[in-house]
Design a protein with these regions (language model features):
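Cap/insert and terminal regions of metallo-dependent hydrolase folds
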Residues: 176, 184-278
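Binuclear metal-dependent hydrolase catalytic cores
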Residues: 1-178, 188, 258-285
């Protein structure tokens, strides 16, 4: 990869649960996982089922066997692929896992509980890879060294009700990408999300619901911790970002509906695009 470039690739774009099948084949059916690669580092955001294919790809690539995984929160659709992540089963690999600080129980304990024998045959402590789990504070930063260092700012937000969510801003070679999944934005955008994303080159934003799903009927989704496509576009406009990538699509939305929602987003923020499985976006030096 050319120096100063970083690449965004989507390995899973669904929220709530995977949605495989012909009706979702164009957009993709795997749950949340985004890779951001610089010339020196592999960064992964969330570990839904998309991380399974990513893991298979990583072990085939040349380069250092090191990966950094940043978790937004611990709902199942964001961690369900971690147990099947190929690098975790190789002693050659070093896997750093980051997430929101939790004192009782700790982040490590919570992840270990998903791999007890009641739920899975291999425990966290039995994985052959060298795994380091780090809890992040509400306003934290991770520096990844290199010829051009990469910085990951972490910001805890209450935009996901009840448990909260970690937002991440990745900065490399003067460019930045913001990862803001599982946020529920009122009209004009959730204030701390908009402030955190201000001026970013790319904003990856939750866009799970239609207006009707969010507001209407006896099963409206208000308070469930996700945005409508309209909310995502309004947040991008308020933050003045370069490009909006709509993410965390509802598993009930087929390819045609996601494309229709993409068109709606563009009427509010023209530089909007629906994230699809396999989509690559390159951010290049100025």
């Amino acid at each position: 990869m050319r120096a100063g470039v970083f690449r965004i690739r989507f390995w899973g774009v669904r929220g709530s649960y995977p949605a495989p099948g012909p009706r979702t084949a164009g957009i993709g059916g795997n749950s949340s996982c985004v890779e951001i690669a610089t010339d020196e580092h592999a960064l992964v955001f969330d570990a839904g089922t998309g991380i399974i294919q990513l893991g298979r790809a990583l072990v085939q690539r040349p380069g250092k066997p090191i990966v950094h995984i940043f978790l937004s929160h611990l709902h199942h659709d964001h961690i369900e692929g971690l147990r099947f992540f190929a690098p975790a089963y190789s002693p050659e690999w070093k896997c750093y896992v980051y997430g929101a600080n939790s004192t009782a129980p700790t982040l490590k304990t919570l992840l270990a509980q998903t791999m007890t024998q009641r739920f899975f045959p291999v425990s966290l402590s039995q994985l052959p890879a060298r795994i380091s789990i780090r809890s992040l504070g509400k306003h934290d930063r991770v520096r990844l060294p290199g010829a051009q260092p990469t910085f990951v700012q972490a910001r805890f937000s209450t935009a996901h009700p009840k448990v909260g969510v970690m937002l991440y801003r990745i900065t490399h070679a003067g460019h930045s990408v913001v990862y803001a999944t599982d946020v529920e934005s009122p009209k004009g955008g959730y204030e701390d999300v908009v402030a955190f994303a201000r001026g970013a080159d790319v904003l990856i934003h939750d866009a799970q619901y239609t207006d009707e799903e969010y507001h209407g009927g006896h099963l409206n989704k208000a308070g469930w911790g996700h945005s409508t496509v309209r909310m995502a576009a309004e947040a991008a406009r308020a933050a003045g970002v370069g490009q909006l990538l709509l993410y965390h699509h509802d598993p009930e939305h087929d390819d045609a509906e996601v494309r229709q929602l993409e068109r709606l987003a563009r009427t509010i923020f023209p530089h909007s695009r629906a994230a699809t499985e396999g989509l690559e976006v390159r951010v290049t030096p100025r």
